Swiss-Prot record:
Its main location: nucleus. Residues 56-106, 115-168 form the LIM zinc-binding domain. GO terms for molecular function: DNA-binding transcription factor activity; DNA-binding transcription factor activity, RNA polymerase II-specific; metal ion binding; RNA polymerase II transcription regulatory region sequence-specific DNA binding; sequence-specific double-stranded DNA binding. This is LIM homeobox transcription factor 1-beta. Residues 176-229, 326-346 are annotated as: Disordered. Transcription factor involved in the regulation of podocyte-expressed genes. Essential for the specification of dorsal limb fate at both the zeugopodal and autopodal levels. The gene is LMX1B. Keywords: Activator, Developmental protein, Disease variant, DNA-binding, Homeobox, LIM domain, Metal-binding, Nucleus, Repeat, Transcription, Transcription regulation, Zinc. GO terms for cellular component: chromatin; nucleus. SMART domains: HOX, LIM. It is found in: Nucleus. One of its GO terms (biological process) is regulation of transcription by RNA polymerase II.
Amino acid sequence: MDIATGPESLERCFPRGQTDCAKMLDGIKMEEHALRPGPATLGVLLGSDCPHPAVCEGCQRPISDRFLMRVNESSWHEECLQCAACQQALTTSCYFRDRKLYCKQDYQQLFAAKCSGCMEKIAPTEFVMRALECVYHLGCFCCCVCERQLRKGDEFVLKEGQLLCKGDYEKEKDLLSSVSPDESDSVKSEDEDGDMKPAKGQGSQSKGSGDDGKDPRRPKRPRTILTTQQRRAFKASFEVSSKPCRKVRETLAAETGLSVRVVQVWFQNQRAKMKKLARRHQQQQEQQNSQRLGQEVLSSRMEGMMASYTPLAPPQQQIVAMEQSPYGSSDPFQQGLTPPQMPGDHMNPYGNDSIFHDIDSDTSLTSLSDCFLGSSDVGSLQARVGNPIDRLYSMQSSYFAS
């Protein structure tokens, strides 16, 4: 952080190498130089003794004017010496910061320090108290809990931009250590603890069993029980602002009859609770989205697998129709029975006459009708064969007669 140097006195003078007679006028040193007539030396003629012209700090050009301005051991043109904010010419004093010049009014408006307690500007003539990078008025440098003004040599803690004296900081540390931020309320209400109040013995036993691994010399931590009205007031204020200012906390403490520190701790725990709930809700949303995405991917894969196979035709019930035929139309000897010998020649049971035409004979077939039996031949064949049942009876009688 640059520290402004100023106000700087302005010097108005002539270039070097000339005789002068000086006088002070309103803080400006005015020097008037007159050239002394006389013969020029050899060094002046050769240029080795000629002084180098001064360079303006504002425009970085050499100054060839009769007069120049001197500020903070740097040279300026008269027209270049002006405020960087309001462009007004600087005549008596100025403020220098970041290689720029400012008048007093603009410098105080732009770069004046502000009190970290009341956020008001600090005048250059005021005494201040510093804590790290924060600057305070003397009256604003006090504890935010007990409002006791801190003096030189007092021990204090700067936490989240707020000043705490040593005593209040130790109380806050003990109170925060006694409260778990994972609970819904660090200070419970009476209606929530209604079921637990009659079991005092069980509560003391459970508390003792929970503290078995801890230091027994440590004193019991204080515990505050809130009523329903107090919780409602805190929640209503929390809905308006999760980080109330000190005045709001003091008002709540006065309305509920609690200390300001208890109110502050409740708001801290409530903020931690809301952050935890938001984090848990976000995790649930991410888990649901991942499950939904997995189901969609699985269903799409199943559809792709099913689409690669052709659908099978539905099974058709084949009904075999059993044709009922008369006994005479079927072979009576299909069941493996040995047919009895027919009377006469068993090789030619139907006689010696040929039923079919002899295809291998010399006579050729003149037409397709020659290959089939004529109607007369069919009738003679049926007369020759007769009824199969009658033939069966005749065969049986001939068998037993022999």
